[in-house]
Amino acid sequence: MLNVKFLEAELRDQFFLDDNKRAWIIGFSGGKDSTMLLQLVWNSIKQFPAEIRQMREVYVICNNTLVENPKILDYTDKILNKIEKAAAEQGMPFRVVRTTPKLEDTFWLNLIGRGYPAPNNVFRWCTERLKINPTTKFILDTVSKTGEAILLLGTREDESTNRAKNMRKHERIGQRLRRHILPNTYAYAPLKDVTTAEVWQYLLQVPSPWGASNRDLITLYSNASGGDCPLVVDTTTPSCGQSRFGCWVCTVVSKDKSMTALIDNGEEWMLPLLELRDLLAVSRDSDYYRETRRRDGTEKEGQMGPYRPWFRAKILEEVLKAQEAIQIEEPQMSLISYQELVAIQILWYRDSIFEFRVSDIYNQIFNSDMMKSDKLEEQKRREAEILQQVCKESSEDIALINEMLTLQKSKILLRKKRGLSDDLETSLERFLDKIVPK
């Protein structure tokens, strides 16, 4: 039977137990488990006098992969705003931290820009880049300031057999904290013995201290199938692919039941997202869409490389079409950022993809000149004319010079000069292979 007073007493005891004032970091996803955890911590600390509450930093960290289910992202963002406002009004020590992947780690930059195939269980390149790295960076930055940190997680043993085994593997008998994989970091799972039924019982009976309605959360769950999206800080923690509220682009699972259910329950504006996700799923294992040579230049029977240039351009086109479609109902929603579009073009240049341009695809769909600059285009035309005059006897020389200039420019824009000489050498070798008979 759920004993709320016991759980709150445990939290208060742990709050006072530490002499070194190490920070608390609460993993918050907006789902049922992390909501219950934050409510318990909030109500426990609120019983202290104001000066005691401020004795340690308490962070509420929420990671946005930038490809979250948009319905859930909108809900979570509103909740985080309420938490920030209520914490300030009530004199609580909570600080909301929103983390996102670095530009070079975003989903679209890797899939469209570098041509990485849609993730599967064998090549799940997304989890570390989108989830683990942003959260880990914040935790390590916090540890460097406070010496140590305690990571409070809403994980429960009855969520899955694997989760239970992992929790028991690291816990110590008679101790609340267990060593985390990150240095000087401890994990604390106050809800580890709480059942799913008890979570719902608590949320129905205990009002949100930041003024939200838990019934809104229940409505979200009633429109899809169960599970929660945990804070992912290591590869042993199941990512959202096996839970209900995951990334809308996730192809690790065969079918996105949550998005399908949301569409069936009236969120028809999300249909373009589901169709795009299904396109990624069918393209993953076909050499029609993927190169036969890998990015490192090796070629082996039974193995495939990145997406072919034409399909990368096709995916970008479909992403932008989906964005145009959903903005009819949700005008503030964006599936891909302007920074990602610019970076994708740079990566295409680095992969010697010159037949497709991001700006052409964007402007065709949105009937816009947003990504064009008249002065820049005029300068490029003048440079092209000069190059044509100088290299009028050899069109191959023009292509080589353009390719090498683009490679150098891409390195400067990405602030990564490492590998420039190798890229230039590869370009020269490819050029010589074409003109020198073997």
Predicted regions and their residues:
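Nucleotide-activated chemistry modules centered on ATP-dependent adenylation/adenylyltransferase
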Residues: M1-I25, K32-K438
